[in-house]
UniProtKB/Swiss-Prot annotation:
Domain called S1-like: residue spans: 1-73
Molecular functions (GO terms): ribosome binding; rRNA binding; translation initiation factor activity
Protein name, UniProt field: Translation initiation factor IF-1
Keywords, ordered alphabetically: Cytoplasm, Initiation factor, Protein biosynthesis, RNA-binding, rRNA-binding
Pfam families: eIF-1a
Disulphide bridges: none
Coiled coil stretches, renumbered: none
Family from the record: Belongs to the IF-1 family.
Lineage summary: Bacteria, Thermotogati, Thermotogota, Thermotogae, Thermotogales
Gene: infA
Function: One of the essential components for the initiation of protein synthesis. Stabilizes the binding of IF-2 and IF-3 on the 30S subunit to which N-formylmethionyl-tRNA(fMet) subsequently binds. Helps modulate mRNA selection, yielding the 30S pre-initiation complex (PIC). Upon addition of the 50S ribosomal subunit IF-1, IF-2 and IF-3 are released leaving the mature 70S translation initiation complex.
């Protein structure tokens, strides 16, 4: 189980929708990562489309993959 200290939250924009609720997200610093939807977003049927601004959680162990935890209001 990971600690709160091991998680980095960053903002980004969805670039591409991929199969199985995966998305390619471009972070504010220009890096592109692969991210999946968190369980609460999936449970509440929150739809994401390319161009949406999102908050992504990254672990310090793998900075190429993340979890989308929040969709910003546009």
């Amino acid at each position: 189980m990971s600690n709160k200290e091991d998680i980095i939250k960053m903002e980004g924009t969805i670039v591409e929708a991929l199969p199985n609720a995966m998305f390619r997200v471009e972070l504010e610093n220009g890096h592109k990562i692969l991210a999946h939807i968190s369980g609460k977003m999936r449970k509440n049927f929150i739809r994401l489309v390319p161009g949406d601004k999102v908050v992504v959680e990254l672990t310090i162990y793998d900075l190429t993959k993340g979890r989308i935890v929040y969709r910003k209001k546009s």
